[in-house]
UniProtKB/Swiss-Prot annotation:
GO cellular component terms, semicolon-separated: mitochondrial inner membrane
GO biological process, one term: mitochondrial electron transport, cytochrome c to oxygen
Recorded name of the encoding gene: COX3
Residue spans crossing the bilayer: 20-40, 45-65, 89-109, 128-148, 166-186, 204-224, 248-268
Entry protein name: Cytochrome c oxidase subunit 3
Known role: Component of the cytochrome c oxidase, the last enzyme in the mitochondrial electron transport chain which drives oxidative phosphorylation. The respiratory chain contains 3 multisubunit complexes succinate dehydrogenase (complex II, CII), ubiquinol-cytochrome c oxidoreductase (cytochrome b-c1 complex, complex III, CIII) and cytochrome c oxidase (complex IV, CIV), that cooperate to transfer electrons derived from NADH and succinate to molecular oxygen, creating an electrochemical gradient over the inner membrane that drives transmembrane transport and the ATP synthase.
EC primary class: translocase
Domain of life of the native organism: Eukaryota
GO molecular function: cytochrome-c oxidase activity
Its EC number(s): 7.1.1.9
Primary location group: mitochondrion
SUPFAM superfamilies (alphabetical): Cytochrome c oxidase subunit III-like (SSF81452)
Membrane topology type: Multi-pass membrane protein
CDD domains: Cyt_c_Oxidase_III
């Protein structure tokens, strides 16, 4: 009788089973960082250790999220209280990402508003030919804003139980995302300056490249959601996996708007 009483859960939270993935992820992170340092300093075995850590992290990401999906979909462990906790976790994660980009914008405004004498005392620097904002950057802005609209369309379709429309919305979003990444790569290949061309190149490639990395991550996120939607993993009430992906994608949209308005447009037109 006592053992039966102990099995009754008297709270709405999910107590996860013991898992090896936190430890394996920590070991993968150690291999990734330590191997990266060894590789950059040309030590023997650094590249192998770096690859081992990278593929370990990828494996843990796949298996850990697989377990989370199983707990939500097949075990019914994601109650309303659990979903609220997941939402708060995603919000805090996005806030931490905002802090990353805040540092890049800080570096840009520090360098552009008060340019030092060794770059000519002007912004853009005298030896740098800046990229016009009205070419590929403007096209990429249209692509990302359109993708934000299409992912919202998919979200409303999921809430309304319209699976076919949701699939169409996600497919359009993925097409826009892939086109954005391709255009960004094309822009980099034809850029008249590189990352080593002073503070302008460093700030430009760090900010836009880090954003491009987030676009790739968001594209993978949405692609996984498309597969899960096809497999009928989402319902009108339970679709936080997609909701998190949509939040992340809107965050990517907003960051790009700030990048376009500051680094591309304002940074191209100012003469300090």
């Amino acid at each position: 009788m006592k053992s039966t009483a102990k099995m009754i859960q008297r709270h709405p939270f999910h107590l996860v089973d013991p898992s090896p993935w936190p430890l394996v992820a920590a070991l993968g992170g150690l291999s990734l960082t330590f191997g990266g340092v060894l590789f950059m300093h040309n030590y023997e075995g650094g590249g192998e250790l770096l690859c081992l850590g990278f593929f370990t992290i990828l494996y843990v990401m796949f298996t850990w999220w697989r377990d989370v999906i199983r707990e939500a979909l097949f075990e019914g462990q994601h109650t309303l209280a659990v979903q609220q906790g997941l939402r708060m976790g995603m919000i805090l994660f996005i806030v931490s990402e905002i802090m990353f980009f805040f540092a890049f914008f800080w570096a840009f405004f520090t360098s552009s508003i008060s340019p030092v004498f060794n770059i000519g005392g002007v912004w853009p620097p005298t030896d740098v030919v800046a990229i016009s904002p009205w070419g590929l950057p403007f096209l990429n802005t249209i692509l990302l804003l359109s993708s934000g609209a299409s992912v919202t369309w998919a979200h409303h379709a999921i809430v309304g139980g319209l699976k076919k429309e949701a699939m169409q919305g996600l497919s359009v979003t993925l097409a826009f995302a892939i086109a954005f990444t391709a255009m960004q790569g094309f822009e980099y290949s034809g850029a008249p300056f590189g990352m080593s061309d002073g503070v302008y190149g460093s700030v430009f490639y760090m900010a836009t490249g880090f954003h491009g990395f987030h676009v790739i991550i968001g594209t993978i996120f949405l692609f996984i959601c498309t597969i899960r939607l096809y497999l009928s993993h989402f319902s009108c009430q339970h679709h936080f996996g997609f909701e998190a992906a949509a939040w992340y994608w809107h965050f990517v949209d907003v960051v790009w708007l700030f990048l376009f308005l500051t680094i591309y447009w304002w940074g191209f037109n100012i003469t300090v």
